[in-house]
A protein has these predicted regions:
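Residue(s) in the substrate-gating loop at a strand-loop-helix junction
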Residues: 147
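Active-site helix of classical SDR
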Residues: 127, 163, 171
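Substrate-binding pocket helix/loop in short-chain dehydrogenase/reductase
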Residues: 103-116, 197, 209
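Conserved glycine-rich cofactor-binding loop
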Residues: 13, 20-22
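Alpha-helical segment proximal to the catalytic Tyr-Lys
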Residues: 132, 175-180, 237
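Short, small/polar-rich loop/turn modules that mediate ligand/substrate recognition or access, typified
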Residues: 93, 179-183, 239-241
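Short C-terminal tail/terminal secondary-structure segment
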Residues: 2-5, 152, 229, 240-257
Length: 257
């Protein structure tokens, strides 16, 4: 087989959460370009409809489904509709999640738990729903979107960093539980120039962060999507339970002090 054929996803059906914008959108488009049919989900229907239209323009099938991953009924509906309308589910990308800086002396335990639920519990629940369908289809692939915040020691990220560290270790543990027919890996992005980050980052902060990054630039959604495609494709057929850092070579936080 030609080496480039190992990066193809033809015959696959992928659910990508949080795929209306940013990293999720880039992953959905990359999977489609590699031959997958894609279910795009997010809280904003307009956003995922636009992404689905781009995927259909590539000649692939696409669904746009509204889903708040914190809502159990919406999670179940997402997976059920994907299976019913696409015929199978082979790939899951747990991209929906997030969280900002926090003050550990003022954030309530309930607020802390919300960050854990948003980033970890929702991914766990979607894996439970999708893995039986993947096994039914003959095998599958799960990709979790973690963060370098999972391994950096930095101020004001005790909630988000803890949640992403939990997601990274959940990735390793589920890889053992779901082997040999379902692989589970994660990408841990560094600072990535999504619409959300661009909207709040002053030029001086960006310059400082780029100066602190060995490769002297911040990431793009396409950087993350390229790593995601590797982990989703047969090119990584002997890889499971691994976290790939895509961070420009940084070994510590590049955020200005």
């Amino acid at each position: 087989m030609n080496i480039l054929q190992h990066f193809q996803l033809e015959g696959s059906v992928a659910i990508v959460t949080g795929s209306g914008r940013g990293i999720g959108r880039a992953i959905a488009l990359a999977y489609a370009e590699a031959g997958a049919d894609v279910v795009c989900s997010a809280r904003s229907l307009a956003d995922v409809q636009a992404v689905a239209e781009q995927i259909r323009a590539m000649g692939r099938r696409a669904l746009a489904i509204t889903c708040d991953v914190l809502d159990p009924e919406q999670r179940q509906a997402l997976v059920r509709q994907s299976h019913e309308q696409m015929g199978r589910v082979t790939h899951l990308v747990n991209n929906a999640g997030g969280g900002g800086p926090n003050d550990p002396l003022s954030m309530s335990p309930g607020e802390f738990e919300q960050i854990l639920n948003f980033n970890v519990s929702t991914a766990y629940a979607l894996c439970q729903l999708c893995v039986p369908l993947m096994r039914e289809a003959g095998g599958g692939n799960i990709l979790n979107i973690s963060s370098v915040a999972a391994r950096y020691s930095q101020r004001h990220f005790s909630a988000y960093g803890t949640a992403k560290a939990a997601l990274s270790h959940l990735t390793r543990l589920l890889a053992q539980d779901f082997a040999p027919h379902v692989r589970v890996n994660a990408v841990a992005p560094g600072p990535t120039l999504t619409e959300a980050l661009n909207g709040v980052m002053p030029a001086a902060m960006r310059q400082a962060m780029e100066a602190n990054t060995p490769l002297k630039r911040l990431g793009t959604p396409q950087d993350i999507a390229a790593a995601a495609l590797y982990l989703a494709s047969p090119a990584s057929a002997w890889v499971t339970g691994k976290i790939i850092d895509v961070d420009g070579g940084a070994d510590a936080t590049v955020w200005p002090a």
